C-alpha cells in the first residue's frame, strides 16, 4: 500500500517507544516499523542512543535520528490529541501525564 492511517500510544514515556520502536529497520512490519522504513544512519543513531546512559548524549542521538526521519517523511503526522482535564480545586498533588492519561499518582494526591 502507498498510504495507511493509524494511531498509537506508547507503553512508557521514553524516546525508545517513539523512535526505536517505529524506525529501526529490524522492526519492520507488525513489531512496530509499519512503514517498512530503513535507513542505516538512523539505525546507527538509534543503537547509539540505547547504548548510553548519558542523557545529554542520548538526547543528541535521538534528535539527530528524528531530524532524518522527519526530513525523509517516513510518517506524516496529521494531528496530536489535545486534552482538557476538569479538576476540583480541592484535589492536591495530581499531575496529568498525556502519555499515561489513565494512570493516577494516588500516593501523592490528597484532598
Regions found by a protein language model. Give the residues of each.
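Extracellular/periplasmic catalytic domains that process cell-envelope and extracellular macromolecules
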Residues: 13, 40, 69-71
Amino acid at each position: 500500500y502507498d498510504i495507511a492511517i493509524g494511531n498509537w500510544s506508547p507503553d512508557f514515556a521514553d524516546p525508545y517507544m517513539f523512535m526505536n520502536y517505529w524506525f529501526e529497520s529490524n522492526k519492520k512490519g507488525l513489531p512496530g516499523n509499519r512503514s517498512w522504513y530503513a535507513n542505516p544512519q538512523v539505525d546507527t543513531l538509534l543503537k547509539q542512543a540505547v547504548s548510553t546512559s548519558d542523557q545529554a548524549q542520548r538526547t543528541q542521538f535521538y534528535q539527530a535520528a528524528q531530524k532524518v526521519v522527519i526530513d525523509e517523511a517516513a510518517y506524516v503526522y496529521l494531528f496530536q490529541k489535545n486534552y482538557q482535564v476538569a479538576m476540583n480545586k480541592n484535589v492536591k498533588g495530581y499531575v496529568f501525564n498525556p502519555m499515561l492519561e489513565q494512570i493516577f499518582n494516588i500516593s501523592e494526591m490528597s484532598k
